[in-house]
Each structure stands twice: as C-alpha cells, then as structure tokens.
Amino acid sequence: MTVHQISLFLENKPGRLAAICRTLTESGVNIASLSLADTTDFGIVRLLVDRWEKARDVLQGAGFGVNVREVVAISAPDEPGALARILEEVDRTGANVEYMYAFAVARGASARFVFRFDDTAKAVAALSAAGISLLDDATIFA
C-alpha cells in the first residue's frame, strides 16, 4: 500500500514556494504535508495532497516540473518507540530508507511517517506482516 507524493524542483528564490501553495489553493487542493530540502540554488519540495492527480496537472500547467512518486505512509501511535519499531521491521528486510519525514495528525492521537525505500515492495510486505498500519491516498487524510 502506497500513497502518491508530488515532488518539485524549486529555484531557491523568494516567492517560489508561495507560488506553489497559491496554485494549489486556487485549485482547491489541500496539502496534508510539505517537506522542503534545499541547497544554495534549488530545493526539492515534497507534498502529500488530497487530490494528487489534480495537483500534478495544475502545477504542470503553471510551469512547474512535477514528479509523482509512490511512497509508504504509516500511522503509528504517538509514543516513544513507535518509529524505532517501524525501522527495526524495515531493517530486517535489508531495505534502505532513502528519505523520510513525519507529521502529526492530532497531539496524542497518532503520528504519520512517510518513507521512500529503495525496495518498496519488500518494506511494505514486512510492515504489513508486522501489523503496522499502512495508509493509502484515501486514508492519509482520515
């Protein structure tokens, strides 16, 4: 089970991130999570949105270079050790975490972790077998 993540290369200039958010706002797309990794000249924006296909289309239409990737989203208890348990299950498979980020839904309710693995199928199988709650495009907003 995976979710669709929108990734964009972004010039490291004032107003560029706002332009992405404004474009999505004007088209009625809701952002669940945003991650920005930057260098001196450019950044990579990673988004989870409620309607990824519409987001892709409107961002491309606005001239942004858009890439859609399947990533693994996990819901876990908001408690010490939850992330460690997830990573231990993945470690057993030999899959590698290429990157990850997290966001909270409601304090004390659950935490959401988003992973890009070098072997998604292997990681998903191990996490599912361990009873870890995987999310899809519909449940990421639930």
Give each language-model segment a name.
Residues 1-142:
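A conserved regulatory-domain signal marking ACT and ACT-like small-molecule sensing domains
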